């Protein structure tokens, strides 16, 4: 599932998302070969590596151009979104990226491919990646933070968030507000064991296995497949409908809730 984590500077959102490479599962051979071919074509396959068993974790700089992100140039080289195929594209300080770059992500997020055109020739590269974004709540980073003063005008905050247009955010299932880290309590160590890298990796492996058996990732379930794999009883349907009205969820938002619920159930082996 695509994710946007936003919160004040120093709250740990970027550090947490940079842990994702350790959670990535091994790929089936067909997907491994696809990832390997793309990196070989881009000249980024290490000489000592014959095949990449995991998807890549790509972290482009905020100054990256559309060509750098999507690909192109004289030889139509694959860009960051194709290098992140079957892996993760992480945009740290996402609001600092050009608006045009962020908007270009919409089509590959929907289709899983990117079409590059050069001198009357078109090249289609795979671009089925998980998008992770980290952002501050406003340009100065203090908006809504207890004990801090936000120096931004209402207009500047509005323009800041306009970079994340509705169509882009519609394709981001998870939007998480991250609070500043508080001092650990005595019980935190025991609780954190359930969320250690090793424990999470095992849960992810279970979820990935279930999704491969279905033949599709939960994030890409169609409306018909949601009905098939995310069936609800009457009580659950009433609860979801109440939440839809309470939070003014669109149909896409309701679908995202069901997909996420299916993933959580998969991780718990239900």
What are these regions (language model features)?
Residues 1, 11-14, 63, 75, ...:
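Short flexible coil/turn linkers enriched for glycine and charged/polar residues
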Residues 3-46, 111:
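Walker A/P-loop
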Residues 50-51, 55-56, 61-89, 122:
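Conserved alpha-helical scaffold flanking the Walker A/P-loop in AAA+ ATPase domains
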Residues 75-76, 99-270:
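Basic, amphipathic alpha-helical bundle interface domains used for macromolecular binding and assembly
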Residues 86, 92-94, 104:
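Walker B catalytic acidic pair
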Residues 89-90, 96-97, 183:
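Residues immediately C-terminal
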